[in-house]
């Protein structure tokens, strides 16, 4: 069966989400599907385009108008699904429900394709805390129930049985053990424990909660030492404000 795995952004080799998507595509292929990966790409010369694997399916141009076409011109993806006779479409939600994504899904369904959408984090409204962020999600909040009504299912890592009024397909989050083999060496943790977090750090990783836990732990003046090593940049101002002051105020720099 031909399948399309659709995302609405590009890739970064060091990004955990990018790696996870490639793991998912590999897993679907190992289940016997003929999978094409559709994604948004910006060439070295600044040309914006929609890609299916290594093939360009739509040139969007450069500049502001190209960004607008990226959000509004989704017919090229539906056309690709129809032209290639793809029977199964797996969409990774970008919190971008709108009339254009709805029309794209309707066209795919009209030709007999089964369409499911993965919502990696649910609920997700609480992730948008500033007014500009909330405003950007306003369109999604207006149209997401309508979009969901045209789907064959919503894939979730949560325990929710229904999302936006539609049934869910509940799966577990995972990794590719071929790409990340299990560690076999056992370290001595008799006297101290070293934790490591390797990421482009975003607030959803929860590093701030771990650090606050360390602050409470060291208030008890413990003999057993616990260290947390963060490898990777703090991605934004929110992450800096939630992590750095806690370290400074509780004198955790050594830990």
Model-derived features: positions:
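Nucleotide-activated donor-binding/catalytic signature segment of Leloir-type glycosyltransferases, i.e.
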Residues: 232, 240-255
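Acceptor-binding helix/loop patch of EC 2.4 sugar-transfer enzymes
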Residues: 8, 12, 115-144, 176-178, ...
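Short N-terminal targeting/anchoring amphipathic segment
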Residues: 78-99, 113-116
